[in-house]
């Protein structure tokens, strides 16, 4: 959807008319944004994510990670056999894109006390696979499915 630049107010309303959230967001002319509904200290909030293009080689893919957990703390994501590492992605942080060749890769989400080597001494929270097509961008959004900091699930968005 195209929105004029400025500070439009985003409203999240239930079918019964109850307003769960009203929050202004900053929109710059010509920008592409993703808006995620997230938990905050005061209830619901909107996280504005700038969707910048990935500078990739022809026929490559790009991937990034968004840690949208409320109290999940820093998380590590390793794709493939350490082909791409995202270390200590803090709650509320969205990483820059990394370039990777298309294909199917396993990925692991973990928490570790060793930030330099996230696979050593780590606690695995999630393991799954991601299929990357050429000339596409992917974001792995991490959420909690219950209040436990270790209850992590992923939503992968292709763009």
Each model region followed by its residue ranges:
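Intrinsically disordered, low-complexity polar regions and short flexible loop motifs
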Residues: 1-159
């Amino acid at each position: 959807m195209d929105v004029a630049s400025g500070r439009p107010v985003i409203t999240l309303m239930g079918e019964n008319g109850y307003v769960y959230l009203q929050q202004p967001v900053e929109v710059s002319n010509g920008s592409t944004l993703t808006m995620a509904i997230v938990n905050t200290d005061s209830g619901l909030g909107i996280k504005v994510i700038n969707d910048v293009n990935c500078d990739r080689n022809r026929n490559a893919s790009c991937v990034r990670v968004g840690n949208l957990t409320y109290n999940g703390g820093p998380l590590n994501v390793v794709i493939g056999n350490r082909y791409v590492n995202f270390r200590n992605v803090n709650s509320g942080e969205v990483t820059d894109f990394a370039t990777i060749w298309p294909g199917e890769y396993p990925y692991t989400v973990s928490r570790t006390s060793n930030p330099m080597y996230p696979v050593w001494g780590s606690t695995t929270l999630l393991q799954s696979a991601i299929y990357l097509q050429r000339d596409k961008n992917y974001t792995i959004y991490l959420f909690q499915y219950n209040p436990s900091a270790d209850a992590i699930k992923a939503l992968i968005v292709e763009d």
